[in-house]
Amino acid sequence: MARLIYLMGPSGAGKDCLLSALRNATPQNRVVAHRYITRPADAGAENHVALSKQEFIQRAEQGLFALHWQAHQHCYAIGIEINLWLQHGLDVLVNGSRAYLPEAQRRYRHQLLPLCLTVSPAILAQRLRQRGRENSEQIDARLQRAQHYQQQLPSHCLQLCNDGELQHTLNQLQQLLTLDTPLSDPVEDKPCN
């Protein structure tokens, strides 16, 4: 059965870099979906489809999104094209929201494989400071939010630590994706310490 691999993690965990590396190394039976976001195309590292707020609302009303949510003053969506890809037997990776995971699970049930990219608090704080988008108060809030969500992950959520080199994390991800883990059974958690 094709899987919807729902990648989550805090800002600064390296999701965009990991998905970009995976796009370049992806086998033919796996695709990485682009997100539709109400922010400029050149904002951040993510390769996304930029929409105005009005375009986003119109597409949502027309049923063109499989999943959509709001976070950090922006709207995010995954297009309905993922349903066609899944029907064709392709595994689909998406950059999802931790807060939206219950809705994604409701919609995709046993097809959904939750995967959380984790980073130790010290490294996450360092990365957030280096990118320079937030002040220290906002960074503290992001760190608290990351810790809260880490504690709330479901037991069947795979965890992948991204404290080291990107290539190492990519290799680990590719190994995880080749496993035939039943999607409804719990798997061993491997958080960062």
From Swiss-Prot:
One cellular component term from this protein's GO annotations in UniProt: cytosol
Residues in coiled coil: none
Superkingdom of origin organism: Bacteria
GO biological process, one term: 5-phosphoribose 1-diphosphate biosynthetic process
Keyword annotations of the record: ATP-binding, Nucleotide-binding, Transferase
Catalytic function, reaction form: alpha-D-ribose 1,5-bisphosphate + ATP = 5-phospho-alpha-D-ribose 1-diphosphate + ADP
Residues engaged in binding ATP: G9, P10, S11, G12, A13, G14, K15, D16
Entries under SUPFAM superfamilies matching the protein: P-loop containing nucleoside triphosphate hydrolases
Pathway entry: Metabolic intermediate biosynthesis; 5-phospho-alpha-D-ribose 1-diphosphate biosynthesis; 5-phospho-alpha-D-ribose 1-diphosphate from D-ribose 5-phosphate (route II): step 3/3
One Pfam match: Guanylate_kin
E.C. designation(s): 2.7.4.23
Signal sequence bounds: none
One function term, GO molecular function aspect: ribose 1,5-bisphosphate phosphokinase activity
PANTHER family: GUANYLATE KINASE-RELATED, RIBOSE 1,5-BISPHOSPHATE PHOSPHOKINASE PHNN
Family of the protein in this entry: Belongs to the ribose 1,5-bisphosphokinase family.
Primary role: Catalyzes the phosphorylation of ribose 1,5-bisphosphate to 5-phospho-D-ribosyl alpha-1-diphosphate (PRPP).
Protein name: Ribose 1,5-bisphosphate phosphokinase PhnN
